[in-house]
Amino acid sequence: MKIFKLLSAGLLLGFGLISTAFGETVTLKFHSFAPAPASQNSKFVKPWADRIEEQSGGELKVETYFAMQLGGKPPQLVDQVRDGVVDIIWTVAGYTPGRFPKIEVFDLPFLPGSAEATSQAAQEFAQTIATEELKDFKILAVHVHSPGKIHTKDRLVMQLSDLEGLKMRGPTRVISSMLGAMGATPVGMPVPQVAPSLSNGVIDGMVVPYEIMPSFKLHELTKAHTTVSGERGLYTTAFLFLMNKAKYESLSDAHKTVIDNNSGMSLAKLAGQLWDGFEGPALELAKRAGGDFHSLSGEKLAAFKTVGDQVVTDWIAKANSNGMDGAAIVQTVRDLILKYEN
């Protein structure tokens, strides 16, 4: 009888261990520089995390840490996810200059269309052309924001010469080079530093899409806003939604399937649709805050495009010197954007 009880207890314990092994909860740590209320977190990252948990039956949980809560600075996010300090990140590719030399092509002036079309182009480009520079990561999505605009504290930019003498924040080295070519003094910094820099007079303005402005109260600190007319925006910025490769590979096949079903082209397209949708409400907030708004067109816009063309030419030359076919890369991006616009 005692032996039977011991055997029964052992079998029950064994079944318990098997059940735990198959139903084990895996926690994934997500890290980003943007604050929790920001649209990219509240309407993109959090819903994505909820889908992961729901579709895994609660076995995959995503702990979200925003505004660099786990330490470090925004340019360190890529290393944090590569090294396994965190499991997932969302960041700007250009915050680590030179790390993603092909992906940075998306930062060039007058290339982007809508965020939806350009995000799909960025995802295909990442999967086919920029594979080497992303080989250390599980790519969840590569996407962009809606075309960026020019914002200053009080000087409305209505022509190229209006940028002269202004200290303008650029998010990446490509966009900073564009601002410099257009006559401004470029100041590179991640977006969390923009509000204090405006308040302290370190910068006179910045280029960002409207969507990010409410998260950092930038619409309250700038009163002059300029956009460009036409099918191509002034610029955009490539975003990386990446997972630690070893962490992904350690998951069960079922858990990998959940991740795979919520990443790739469909996620990039969704991101683009969301970012396009974020722009309108944020613009309305800027309008309610008061100020001047202008859209460049005609000869004034042509002058900006002439400078933009030279920035592209210079980027191609630099890419060629680094062993890439710069012209082919730029043309590929243009073709991909057209593909997803049609």
Feature map (PLM): residue ranges:
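Sec/Tat signal peptide C-region and signal peptidase I cleavage site
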Residues: 17-23
